[in-house]
Amino acid sequence: MINIYWFKRDLRLEDNEPLHEASKQSEKLLLIYFLEDKLISDPHYSNFHWNFVKQSIEDINLSLGKKSILFLNCDPIEGFKKISEKYKIKSIYSHMETGIELTYLRDIDVKKYCDSNSIHWFEYEKNYVKRGLKNRKSWIKGWNEYVKSPVLKIDIKNLNILDIKHLSKIFNVLDTRTNKNKHLQPGGTSNGLKYLRSFLEVRNKSYNQNISKPLESRSSCSRLSPYLSWGNLSSRYVLSLIHI
């Protein structure tokens, strides 16, 4: 029996609540990312995005050492069914994805699949985003409490990660290698931290005078958007380093 951690737009180990909770369980933990054909063909995305994802996964794998994420090009339900032929899935852990309609409908289908197969799916809020709020009267209070709460640490040495070598025989595991492009920001937590540190230490000094200048603002702004969007960094982790 195993548990699964399903990476979505939360490609990090640090300050990752569902991963933190999954790490407390006794079962082996399979780390997985699905590169879905429906999303590949969706006009919201391009190869730039998927290369960023690959680089983010590679960055995590480097931190994990001998273990790695099972990186697949398939539909999540299809993947879970195939994994179930080899292992009994007890629970799936993930963040609630705040994406597009396609991912929302996919998650509804995954929930139905889990319910019909007695799989517990534990979803956690990402960056204190609340689904279905009727008003935001108490939201700011909760947000302040969230960002001031302790950043969750992961002890990688104690992560009971399932070795994917057996699953590699029944899946075509994707390669994370990408061509380097000096004009694009590379994905991964380690790269996000480099941009954050350079902003806090140097580039922020010209932020106010350059923010409205198209050329100068490229270097004086934080450049953290992709790292927050794809979850290489959590908003709480960033704010903890800024000490606001």
Stretch-by-stretch model annotation:
Residues 1-153:
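Trp/Phe/Arg-rich N-terminal binding region typifying the photolyase-homology
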Residues 117-119, 138-241:
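Glycine/tryptophan-enriched, flexible segments
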